[in-house]
Amino acid sequence: MAAGKFASLPRNMPVNHQFPLASSMDLLSSKSPLTEHRPDAYQDVSIHGTLPRKKKGPPPIRSCDDFSHMGTLPHSKSPQQNSPVTQDSIQESPWQDRHCETFTFRDPHLLDPTLEYVKFSKERHIMDRTPEKLKKELEEELLLSSEDLRSHAWYHGRIPRQVSENLVQRDGDFLVRDSLSSPGNFVLTCQWKNLAQHFKINRTVLRLSEAYSRVQYQFEMESFDSIPGLVRCYVGNRRPISQQSGAIIFQPINRTVPLRCLEERYGISPGQAREGSLTEGRPDVTKRLSLTMGGVQAREQNLPRGNLLRNKEKSGSQPACLDHMQDRRALSLKAHQSESYLPIGCKLPPQSSGVDTSPCPNSPVFRTGSEPALSPAVVRRVSSDARAGEALRGSDSQLCPKPPPKPCKVPFLKAPSSPSAWLNSEANYCELNPAFATGCGRGAKLPLCAQGSPTELLTAKQNGALGPRNSGINYLILDDDDRERPWEPAAAQTEKGQWDKGEFVAPLLETVSSFRPNDFKSKFLPPENKPLETAMLKRAKELFTNNDPKVIAQHILSMDCRVARILEVSEEMRRNMGVSSGLELITLPHGHQLRLDIIERHSTMAIGIAVYILGCTGTLEDRAATLSKVIQVAVELKDSMGDLYSFSALMKALEMPQITRLEKTWTALRHQYTQTAILYEKQLKPFSKILHEGRESTCVPPNNVSVPLLMPLVTLMERQAVTFEGTDMWEKNDQSCEIMLNHLATARLMAEATDSYRMNAERILAGFQPDEEMNEICKTEFQMRLLWGSKGAQVNQAERYEKFNQILTALSRKLEPPPVKQAEL
């Protein structure tokens, strides 16, 4: 760009001082007249690239002009000195001693008009775009997804702290920007009570498993999955950002240019966060170009690789735009005709007291030309100091990906443990006290804030110390040790032995089933019994046949409410569960044992009904009558009791392949109990299908349900692996994924409506007096002892179900043998 300005100039010519080139570039408004010099004292004009090379001798003494951050217009001028001053942009002052070839350090605050012109030309190229293009680019950003932070005009990206304070002028004004002191985090800047305030948005990483994690954002109270959601809540509800400040936001300050323009205008890239924060409090400090080693290293490290605009500007031997850095590790560059010599060694400046330094000798190795280095090392920055003795990358080599850094043989320069300077400017935020849940992590034992990574969190956890508050990222991890550690509910009890409801009590992790068949005392069963004893089967059949279907349904509902912990839940049981109902407990991780018990009762009841149909009948008419009685009980459970859990168990028994294959039995049912058969085909089967597809909300009034459908949820949560064998019918549907989401959504509603289910069950069972014998055969322990015996009831679930499935198949084939195929002739 700048080379085109000088293309018409010859290499050897005296420059006319009456029309200086600097004035044509509108860089300097006014300067003192130049001191008269001989024409032969001027050096040749260098047009190699865009930056002139430093000549021999001491640097000229110039006046220090402070420019704005744009680098185009002067802010203020210091008094001029009468020493020789360079005014032309490409003209060099003559040196009196031409034999001096020593490297000198340049003061970063001394301005070089030539270097300022390079930055001026770049920013003029950036900003000289038509408003229509900028408006179109801004509209494209605002049309992104609402969850994308860039789609909100109140997000201003990487703007300095001082600029954000100037944008908020009235109480309630706010904007969101990137944190320059903590890259990757965000800051909300607002004005309240005529004072600009900055609130760092706390970022929490929830690690649900080794492969999945979720990020949440919060100020003090509620956490959100996205920053737009957080802002919408605080703006819409006029909620104070913090209790201490009471700041309320309601008026967003919108940006008028794309984020790219803001980034290029203020010259702050993601890697420049900490360096940029040093000068944010001083807007009058010029961000000027510098050929210092520190500037090169900082720009090399912090230049974003994905910025195509900046990469495009670097071509040939033109170096990248080098911004000013605070550390003054400078090294002048030697110039020889058109070749550039880049020294690899560096010289460390004098360190402040208290810092242990080790001198690094200069390396005599140089790289010539503008070819990329063969093995350029990445310059790394540790704290506020840098390593020495690493190669300086060329301008063209920056276009290529950086290779992994080589080990540095120079010892690190460790700064004292006192707070850094940048903490006093950018990292000062208003105090927030996030309300993290201490129940799962037990508060002080598990640190919620860790700076850097989860590894530091675990280290802090072992040391028993909390991490620093200003890290901005919180990791919540629940490891195996925390899960397996026995809970201590007694710690939450008062001295009088009473539970304080205002204090959190860690729930009890149950590991033993509530069903204990061997400890069950029965009027019908001896202490030890064999599976399927004939006398016990006949007694159970008599009770089932002689009672009304509604009475049987009431006994089943009463027992279901106890097993699911809907009714008869004591205070101690609530304290151990951590919730008030078992319907909510089955949705929580520590409800594992209750889910297993629910699966056990459901499967045992279905198998018991199948045995009642197949093994307790003699003639075809008896089987048809038994089938009719089961259907009537299912109707009562559905309509009168609202017990969808046991209703699904009875329907599972009726739809077993060992039952559906009994064609003669179903034919006799249609002939002798026609109304019951029609009721089963037209109402019960379609309703069961709707339930298992997650569409019960469309056909079941909520005020009529006492026990909801539980099996799809507990089956999904307890299934160890995805298998195609043993899956339910709804899982083989083409819409199985949508059905699964319906069941999960229903589970959330079920956990919220536990009080409604409890009141419905109490209303339905009001005045119910259970029969002792009928109540006993409805218990799960009795059914387990009856089906598997006293010894078989202790065997694994899967093994018991598999063997009994074979028994049912044998009974079904005995009652109605399969048709014999004719022998092939």
From Swiss-Prot:
Phosphorylated on tyrosine residues. Residues 154-253 form the SH2 domain. Its main location: cytoplasm. The modification N-acetylalanine is found at A2. Residues 31-93 are annotated as: Disordered. It is found in: Cytoplasm; Cell junction, Focal adhesion. Residues 744-748 are annotated as: Mediates the interaction with BCAR1/p130CAS. InterPro entries: Ras_GEF_dom_sf (IPR023578), RASGEF_cat_dom (IPR001895), RASGEF_cat_dom_sf (IPR036964), SH2 (IPR000980), SH2-Ras-GEF_adapter (IPR051853), SH2_dom_sf (IPR036860), SH2_SHEP1/BCAR3/NSP1 (IPR044102). Pfam families: RasGEF, SH2. GO terms for cellular component: cytoplasm; focal adhesion; membrane. The modification Phosphoserine is found at S32, S78, S83, S182, S290, S358, S363, S375, S471. GO terms for biological process: endothelin receptor signaling pathway; epidermal growth factor receptor signaling pathway; insulin receptor signaling pathway; positive regulation of cell population proliferation; positive regulation of GTPase activity; positive regulation of MAPK cascade; small GTPase-mediated signal transduction. The keyword Acetylation applies. SUPFAM superfamilies: Ras GEF (SSF48366), SH2 domain (SSF55550). Residues 548-818 form the Ras-GEF domain. The keyword Cytoplasm applies. Keywords: Acetylation, Cell junction, Cytoplasm, Guanine-nucleotide releasing factor, Methylation, Phosphoprotein, SH2 domain. Signal peptide: none annotated. The modification Omega-N-methylarginine is found at R442. GO terms for molecular function: guanyl-nucleotide exchange factor activity; phosphotyrosine residue binding. Part of a complex comprised of PTPRA, BCAR1, BCAR3 (via SH2 domain) and SRC; the formation of the complex is dependent on integrin mediated-tyrosine phosphorylation of PTPRA. Within the complex, interacts (via SH2 domain) with PTPRA (when phosphorylated on 'Tyr-798'). Interacts (via Ras-GEF domain) with BCAR1. Interacts (via Ras-GEF domain) with NEDD9. Interacts with PTK2/FAK1. Interacts with PTPN1. Interacts (via SH2 domain) with EGFR (when tyrosine-phosphorylated). The SH2 domain mediates interaction with tyrosine-phosphorylated proteins. However, not involved in the binding to phosphorylated BCAR1. Required for cell cycle progression in response to INS/insulin. Required for regulation of EGF-induced DNA synthesis. The Ras-GEF domain appears to adopt a closed conformation rendering it incapable of carrying out canonical exchange factor function, this closed conformation is probably required for interaction with BCAR1. Acts as an adapter protein downstream of several growth factor receptors to promote cell proliferation, migration, and redistribution of actin fibers. Specifically involved in INS/insulin signaling pathway by mediating MAPK1/ERK2-MAPK3/ERK1 activation and DNA synthesis. Promotes insulin-mediated membrane ruffling. In response to vasoconstrictor peptide EDN1, involved in the activation of RAP1 downstream of PTK2B via interaction with phosphorylated BCAR1. This is Breast cancer anti-estrogen resistance protein 3 homolog. It comes from Macaca fascicularis. The gene is BCAR3.
